[in-house]
């Protein structure tokens, strides 16, 4: 029985790429800087001491980081026995965003340039805003700027509740984000507005990767909270991913846990499972792994590393999240059968010690575990698509256009 379990630790980069200068990210190192802060006692809020990831270390994480950066992460064991195969991978795609990273993991790099709303104030074209107001019958809008999602709620959340005007904002990513209160504005109404925005952005030729619904609750600045009802409306990948090939060519199954289905615009997904928070994502993943039959991929995105700690530049929170992940990792490993493979990876970086609030251009770890996987280094991979090609070879689908199988 052949099954592949892919776990994306969203934003867990392991050191700047060779082209990081193009992105202003020279020196970025999500893992290394978290480990450094922990070793210095600067991340003791809710946790304590050096970064403690024994299970990820056994799968080759410290070695992969060393390959990427040339040094062993502070306070971590560079001499631990390694029981998995490990690599560090460079992104071929032109961006450092979620769809680009995930699509490339599945064998389809993004070789075109996304559209962006680069102006920090008055970010969106007036023509687009006017169409949204008219089509959705809105009383107006708030925001129209670059912002962190939590900051803008404190700034505009109360006014939104009073006026019913949705909050429009963006970032350095190719996104159009809409924040609305679940109760005063309504979740269904927010989703409908996002559908309209997706249509207008596509028809207008803006080439924007995602429209993101950002629902929140609370009654005043300081206690607004984003909920787990986020919804991403992505464009479809430009070519069939390995997920699609498994379904089409092998009559296989692809189970999305978390936001995976949204990222691939539901292409190549046969089952969707929603879950919010690290523990809930783990629980859902374990359930699906136990139930998975032959020719199945279970694909989980652990978004909290990015959304809760990376973008918010919360080093201690990120470290605590990694340690929780590591503590629960053996639960996944013990479900890996004789012919199965478990792949742990990331989609980009988001160094919580870096300036600003945006992603960072970094190598990603590629950690592969299974009874038939030979432990040791798989070296520097020139594209994330090597993961997709490896999975294609494993399941016996037609080759992907990009990437080289790692084994």
Curated annotation (Swiss-Prot):
It holds the Pfam family Metalloenzyme. Keywords: Cytoplasm, Isomerase, Manganese, Metal-binding. It catalyses: 2-deoxy-alpha-D-ribose 1-phosphate = 2-deoxy-D-ribose 5-phosphate; alpha-D-ribose 1-phosphate = D-ribose 5-phosphate. Mn(2+) 2 binds at residues 306, 311, 359. Belongs to the phosphopentomutase family. Isomerase that catalyzes the conversion of deoxy-ribose 1-phosphate (dRib-1-P) and ribose 1-phosphate (Rib-1-P) to deoxy-ribose 5-phosphate (dRib-5-P) and ribose 5-phosphate (Rib-5-P), respectively. This is Phosphopentomutase. The gene is deoB.
